[in-house]
Amino acid sequence: MLQKRLFYLDNLKVCLTVLVIFHHAGQAYGDGGGWAYHPSNPAEVMPWIWHFFSTNAAFFMGLYFLISGYFVPKSFDKQGAGTFVKKKLIRLGIPWLLMGGLLSVLAGKLETGHMWFVENLLFFSLVYAGIRLFCKPLLSCTSKPTIIGLFIVGALMGVGSYFIRQESPQDHWIFWMGLIFEPAHYLQYVMMFFLGILACRFEWLEKMENRIGAIALLIGIVLAIGNYARDGGEWNAFVYRWFGIYESLMCVFISFGLLWLFREYGNWSSRFWQWCAAQSYGAYIFHMILMLLLQYATDTIWMRAFGKFMFIGTAITIASFVLTWLVRMIPGVKKVL
């Protein structure tokens, strides 16, 4: 029996892809860190946008990993180890090598950029396949998401992240044995991927009660507002000190809250949303190059920082999805994108 298409997960991934694009669009006009482009006009800056970056980084890639992990068990069960690994190497390995190679050539050094996600998702999938060769799949059980359960998961993630950040602070990236990763967030990504696997096996997304989903979303929103409210003072000092824990709780509650919200109110299946879902993976892959080209091309055009941010984000969102659609018309490309 064919599994019913979960349109709400497709739609949520589309929204996450757009959020990633806007996140990167803003980096040049805030604290871009290692961003490849910096405006020549020093007035093009948005000091407040670090709140946007901080809140996004708390959950959006973790939620990506959870959704990706959700589809892994049934894909492995259906295809078997050999086909599963082969398809992952094609769909994840080829874009990682090609885009990573292009970014490295442009940067003049080894550089994977945003492809770190694809690289690590491939690694997680291969580890899962290796484990399944020796272990039987997890059996179903009657458990379902609860607020206390979500809090415990967030707290465990947070305590671990807190201690990791004592040695490796946020935005410190490491290249190790072919993998590039940020230790400060890595525990979150591993746990969220594993939660996705459990959510599939135990049918947590289907079992999550409306009351639990709504409360989780409300808690996540309150934590996000608290993060945006940081502006010096005791509250900022408190959140900054315990941010590994604060961020992890925000990640878990926002993620499960959004999963509930889209399950109940975002299960659209129009042709437009199905088209967007089909292009979202490629849009993630292509958007970085397109964005840098447009940022350099519009460097001397004055729109104010917020205007540039919105223009770049909107234009590259459209361009990335359209470019993916065109590239996927090439025979054989749909197996990759």
Region roles according to the model:
Residues 1-337:
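Alpha-helical transmembrane segments and their immediate juxtamembrane cytosolic regions
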